């Protein structure tokens, strides 16, 4: 478990061999109204269960309510989770190193106005948090501590490989819509999301098989637990595209990276040949991820 980033910058390319999660507390308190989180989908379920166990640090007279209870709206994910940006200190660990990462913070409806000014100090941060700075910092520490304990307490890592199924399917819907737009005014032979969908199907099958295996695993069996943990940890790292150079395109993550190899790039381009190549490479990246999650590559039977 890692909480500091500066001493680790020289190890980013091999950090997935040294750590299994990165939790960032940079800028953890800049307001008091909302909780916002940027994270790998592997950590979504863990965060939700953790927030149900941590009391709201401010309370507003409602003693006993958890942070989860205080989230406004019915849709927890929509209210709390937001895309991870490049300026987030957790971003390179996710998009460059392929480590499940999470950034957690208390914010206000308006952005914190004092960054980079002489007013960026404890006094004005107190104003921004309505003098609840200590309580909010304590709450943030409790969330981070609970996350760490839940990750290391059990013999099997609490990474939810199922959650990526939903995320990947959402991307397929967007890409299919894009392909319809591109092919509307002419034929584009071979330009189809068929194989991409098959690769996502392979991932879904691998995730379901792992869940079944978890139900039948003796958690006192160290070797079995190690094997399962190793397969879960391969998911994030294998979503780093192997078809671009880390030197030229450092943020190689298929979903969270930047460059022509990403899912997002497929929604922007007009060149059909380039799009066909992007689809093929994305398919192979996802299939490789599915194969890694499945375990022994010699036991895998697929046609891609």
Where are these regions (language model features)?
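Secretory-pathway/membrane protein signature
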Residues: 1-304
